[in-house]
Regions:
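A short, conserved beta-strand element enriched in hydrophobic/aromatic residues
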Residues: 12-14
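Glycine-rich, highly charged phosphate/nucleotide-binding loops
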Residues: 16-27
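Acidic two-metal-ion nuclease catalytic site recognized across multiple nuclease folds
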Residues: 135-173
Length: 173
């Protein structure tokens, strides 16, 4: 009910024009399993990916294949933001402070940086805000951007760990 209210969905319209869950899951699968797709989101590994897995599981679709098959990769832009925040905040982003602590929530970063898309928890606006963050990091700190992007490659990550004398962990947990 909260998501319906937050997204201002009309239940009657959804019932009239929407898809049943299995058909919806198959449409999502067909898009997410396109070869060499980079599935990108903000805080997606901790939220969206889990929802997709559960949707697929309930509908007897392999819940993990979409993230690795056909050369696909999962990118969580929040990981880029965490790296930017932890290793020099000179990336062109302003990091908001909420209740005395830095906030890396997408809506707070969007407000602090005056992004055009301000309707939070709207999928299209969240996508625009995520894209804005990536464009800023890529233009201001291309090495950081490329380093973080490389972390989606298993071999790259393994080699970085094995070749390094110094290892950092940056995360929310």
């Amino acid at each position: 009910p909260e998501a319906i209210l937050a997204n201002q969905l009309d239940i009657k319209k959804c019932n009239r024009e929407g898809l049943d869950e299995l058909k919806f899951a198959l449409v999502v699968q067909s898009v997410m399993e396109l070869p060499t797709t980079y599935i990108t989101g903000y805080n997606s590994k901790r939220f969206d990916d889990e929802l997709i897995r559960y949707l697929f599981y309930r509908n007897l679709i392999d819940p993990y294949r979409w993230g690795w098959a056909e050369g696909n990769k999962r990118i969580d832009v929040m990981d880029h933001v965490l790296l930017a925040y932890a290793f020099g905040r000179d990336v062109g982003l302003q990091f908001p402070v909420v209740d005395g602590q830095a906030s890396l929530k997408l809506e707070h970063i969007a407000e602090e940086n005056r992004f055009e898309a301000r309707n939070h928890h709207d999928a299209l606006n969240d996508t625009k805000n995520t894209k804005s963050i990536m464009e800023i990091i890529r233009s201001q700190r291309p090495q950081l951007f490329d380093f973080a992007l490389g972390l989606v490659e298993e071999e790259v990550t393994k080699n970085r760990i094995l070749d390094s004398n110094l290892l950092y962990h940056v995360g929310t947990r």
